């Protein structure tokens, strides 16, 4: 089956979640019934929002409901793995809705593939990134006291079909991370391509590079 790339641009989180779920359910149904389907790689950005995964702890959100309103943000409890994270303008979010079995992937291998694609995109900008032991996502200087996260990853899988995905900080307002313990960490920082390079980064260019890396990785399986 073919894999298509879609760009939702700036979209409210609730609408993106609803669309994702609809396409995810349709792919699961098609797979179970031997029908044709399309794998999708979705790019978007969200207005200010925090999402708390299934294993997340409420105390990693440091603001109450009224305080969230004052910073123009909302909070959603969602069905992905992982803890709490932030999404907002300037952050590239990618939601692959894929039949992993078509690509010969298990869930652990899939998460590794997402990380590797982001690591390669960072490298294309001269930013050296990698993994942190016993943690998901993509990090800079992960084995030092200056460890900082540039990309969060949290997925849901059912019948080897995926939804949710990754969030890469490109030109993200990093102040919004100060209101949470990102991904449950209290002793790790966050960063962005803009922060590391000292300049604004063209979002369309990052989308193109990440889309190319993801497709290449999937097709190599």
UniProtKB/Swiss-Prot annotation:
GO function term, MF aspect, one: lipoyl(octanoyl) transferase activity
Top-level taxon of origin: Bacteria
Detail which positions bind substrate: 80-87, 152-154, 165-167
- Where would I find the BPL/LPL catalytic domain in this sequence? 35-221
Q: Which reaction does it catalyse?
A: octanoyl-[ACP] + L-lysyl-[protein] = N(6)-octanoyl-L-lysyl-[protein] + holo-[ACP] + H(+)
Q: Which Pfam families match?
A: LplA-B_cat
Active site (record annotation)? 183 (acyl-thioester intermediate)
What UniProt keywords apply to this chain's record, in alphabetical order?
A: Acyltransferase, Cytoplasm, Transferase
- EC number(s) on file: 2.3.1.181
Q: Which GO terms describe its biological process?
A: protein modification process
Family matches, as PROSITE patterns: BPL_LPL_CATALYTIC, LIPB
Pathway membership of this protein? Protein modification; protein lipoylation via endogenous pathway; protein N(6)-(lipoyl)lysine from octanoyl-[acyl-carrier-protein]: step 1/2
Q: From which residue to which does any coiled coil extend? A: none
Cell compartment(s), UniProt: Cytoplasm
In this chain, the site described as Lowers pKa of active site Cys is at 149
Note from the entry: In the reaction, the free carboxyl group of octanoic acid is attached via an amide linkage to the epsilon-amino group of a specific lysine residue of lipoyl domains of lipoate-dependent enzymes.
The record's listing under PANTHER family reads: OCTANOYLTRANSFERASE
* Sequence similarity: Belongs to the LipB family.
Q: What does this protein do?
A: Catalyzes the transfer of endogenously produced octanoic acid from octanoyl-acyl-carrier-protein onto the lipoyl domains of lipoate-dependent enzymes. Lipoyl-ACP can also act as a substrate although octanoyl-ACP is likely to be the physiological substrate.
Protein name per Swiss-Prot or TrEMBL: Octanoyltransferase
Which gene name does the record give?
Answer: lipB
